């Protein structure tokens, strides 16, 4: 039987939209932008299951809850990718590459993939602890997800030979995901709507510029004809034609 350790007291140490199962399980599941998969994952044996809507504070909360439980050695990424934030891709990049000196996740493609409340040591502990990331991004097939969880459990290497690390995440300011111990996730539908509104705004601006150009062109053309006609009449008058 794999060796197990006690997680930090009060685990999970950061509250959120999580469903908690067996704290001795080796599997954590991130459902990204999807909901409704949690109970099936818990029934399959996961330790903790929940979404991740943002590529900064959301990921910080995952790191904090994972490294405070040495038993979690696998991370399953599933559910629909969060448009704009790309939290699944950012989590993979974090595990593969870590963070730079500025806190930016190396290779991440999300909008703002910067970790302000988690240092390199915590990130490196997370990377050491998680031995495998199972990529089921954009998969909501319960059978595939639960099968992946069971396969991870069958390969359980036991708890990492390090003590739990407790991170104290600072409360975010206005408009951030965290405010105290509560979570205010960014809806993926809103993120998609904002992206479409930006595209529409750009198209409107382009159309306005084109209309302005056309208006100036036609006005100039009319003025040119009028001036040409006036000059012609003047010349005819001078020549006595």
Swiss-Prot record:
EC number in record: 7.2.1.4
Pathway: One-carbon metabolism; methanogenesis from CO(2); methyl-coenzyme M from 5,10-methylene-5,6,7,8-tetrahydromethanopterin: step 2/2
Species assigned in the record: Methanocaldococcus fervens (strain DSM 4213 / JCM 15782 / AG86)
GO biological process: one example: one-carbon metabolic process
Cofactor descriptive note: Binds 1 5-hydroxybenzimidazolylcobamide group.
Annotated function: Part of a complex that catalyzes the formation of methyl-coenzyme M and tetrahydromethanopterin from coenzyme M and methyl-tetrahydromethanopterin. This is an energy-conserving, sodium-ion translocating step.
Disulfide bonding pattern of the chain: none
Coiled coil: none
Reactions it catalyzes: 5-methyl-5,6,7,8-tetrahydromethanopterin + coenzyme M + 2 Na(+)(in) = 5,6,7,8-tetrahydromethanopterin + methyl-coenzyme M + 2 Na(+)(out)
Enzyme kind, highest EC tier: translocase
Keyword DNA damage: no
Cross-referenced HAMAP family: MtrA
Record protein name field: Tetrahydromethanopterin S-methyltransferase subunit A
GO molecular function, one term: tetrahydromethanopterin S-methyltransferase activity
Gene assigned in the entry: mtrA
Cofactor: 5-hydroxybenzimidazolylcob(I)amide
GO CC field: plasma membrane
Similarity remark: Belongs to the MtrA family.
Keyword Methyltransferase assigned: yes
